[in-house]
UniProtKB/Swiss-Prot annotation:
Organism name: Nicotiana tabacum (Common tobacco)
Keyword Hydrolase carried by entry: yes
Pfam families noted in UniProt: DEAD, Helicase_C
UniProt feature coiled coil, ranges: none
Top-level EC class as recorded in UniProt: hydrolase
Cellular component GO terms, alphabetical: cytoplasmic stress granule
One BP annotation, GO: cytoplasmic translational initiation
Assigned EC number: 3.6.4.13
Name the record gives this protein: Eukaryotic initiation factor 4A-15
Superkingdom of origin organism: Eukaryota
């Protein structure tokens, strides 16, 4: 389960700039390595032929902005801090960097990737396996909620890459089922979430068990001050690839709000929307597991076909629900922030924040589902009186204006 952010850690632009200035001040001026090369095609990156085959077979034609700048320094063994929003090809960036450097004849774990949720870890495992299809990569996901014995069996048979959540990975290292001797690459994905209070200590514990000379990659959609601070602890002159704060919201996603006078009127507002819009697929976010169940029951009682998933469900049930949603047999998914970072569905055209997120950072992970790789999408936020402060925080955080939902919203989908 993703850890909660530290008390009082809401993003503050001045705090961010102060921390960045500290890192770039006289004491920190040598902290970063500059790397300015941009590669307009995958062919120009000097990648192995069989890795290129995997990249093209996966459906990539041209590298995204983060891939143009991020794959090659990682392939060269440099430590990297990369900030890019959801849906920009961030996962494929570090997967390509890892796959390029593996010694495939050595069937030992050489790369360890940590992610904050099971769903995201499994998503990364799929991308790694697909891109490395022609290289013969052996990759496994070690995540909570699955059989420890099965993980131990797979690890003892030999793998090149382990992707996992911090708790299970630390457990495997502690039991010596995962041997760290040959690990030469360590990646933290969604570091903003991982380095919040819930996982910070576990990451330190894992890092202590890894070889001293190791390449570290930190990948994140947002870069709160604590994420920048912690990079000092275990990175060596990293290449820094940051997008400006005001570029963080995905282009192509239209964002609106609907004023709802009372919390209990949100349901009527939602049903009205579904009666007026032709929706391919949509995700509805609420803030608690109990509310997922409540809203699912209410929608079904009004003859809306919906699926629901949250952290109280066992892993097998969640996998089945996500498979149905990906295949399109289920068109509406109700969920919580916990799963926001593991949903990768190309057809999602609409995200509804039935509840606004409790932290501005999570807004990006939610609406980033609705327009991946330039696809158009719409995000609609339900806003009560109590939410007005958070709405203005979100607008300030991402430097965007979220407008009131127009009458012709159907034309936008």
């Amino acid at each position: 389960m993703a850890g909660a952010a530290p008390e009082g850690s809401q993003f503050d632009a001045r705090q961010f700039d102060t921390k960045m200035n500290e890192l770039l001040s006289a004491d920190g001026q040598d902290f970063f390595t500059s790397y300015d090369e941009v590669y307009d095609s995958f062919d120009a990156m000097g990648l192995q032929e069989n890795l290129l085959r995997g990249i093209y077979a996966y459906g990539f034609e041209k590298p995204s902005a983060i891939q143009q700048r991020g794959i090659v320094p990682f392939c060269k063994g440099l430590d990297v801090i990369q900030q890019a929003q959801s849906g920009t090809g961030k996962t494929a960036t570090f997967c390509s960097g890892i796959l390029q450097q593996l010694a495939y004849e050595l069937l030992e774990c050489q790369a360890l990737v940590l992610a904050p949720t099971r769903e995201l870890a499994q998503q990364i495992e799929k991308v790694m396996r697909a891109l490395g299809d022609y290289l013969g990569v052996k990759v496994t996901a070690c995540v909570g909620g699955t059989s420890v014995r099965e993980d131990q069996r797979i690890l003892s048979s030999g793998v090149h890459v382990v992707v996992g959540t911090p708790g299970r990975v630390f457990d495997m290292l502690r039991r010596q089922s995962l041997r760290p001797d040959h690990i030469k690459m360590f990646v933290l994905d969604e570091a903003d979430e991982m380095l919040s209070r819930g996982f910070k200590d576990q990451i330190y514990d894992i890092f202590q068990l890894l070889p001293p000379k190791i390449q570290v990659g930190v990948f994140s959609a947002t870069m709160p001050p604590e994420a920048l601070e912690i990079t000092r602890k275990f990175m060596n002159k990293p290449v820094r690839i940051l997008v400006k704060r005001d570029e963080l919201t995905l282009e192509g996603i239209k964002q609106f709000y609907v004023n709802v006078d009372k919390e209990e009127w949100k349901l009527e507002t939602l049903c009205d929307l579904y009666e007026t819009l032709a929706i391919t697929q949509s995700v509805i976010f609420v803030n608690t597991r109990r509310k997922v169940d409540w809203l699912t029951d209410k929608m079904r009682s009004r003859d809306h076909t919906v699926s629901a998933t949250h952290g109280d469900m066992d892993q097998n049930t969640r996998d089945i629900i996500m498979r149905e949603f990906r295949s399109g047999s289920s068109r509406v998914l109700i969920t919580t922030d916990l799963l926001a970072r593991g949903i990768d569905v190309q057809q999602v055209s609409l995200v509804i924040n039935f509840d606004l997120p409790t932290q501005p950072e999570n807004y990006l992970h939610r609406i980033g589902r609705s327009g991946r790789f330039g696809r158009k999408g719409v995000a609609i936020n339900f806003v009560t009186k109590d939410d007005e402060r958070m709405l203005s925080d979100i607008q300030r955080f991402y430097n965007v204006v979220i407008e009131e939902l127009p009458a012709n919203v159907a034309d936008l989908l």
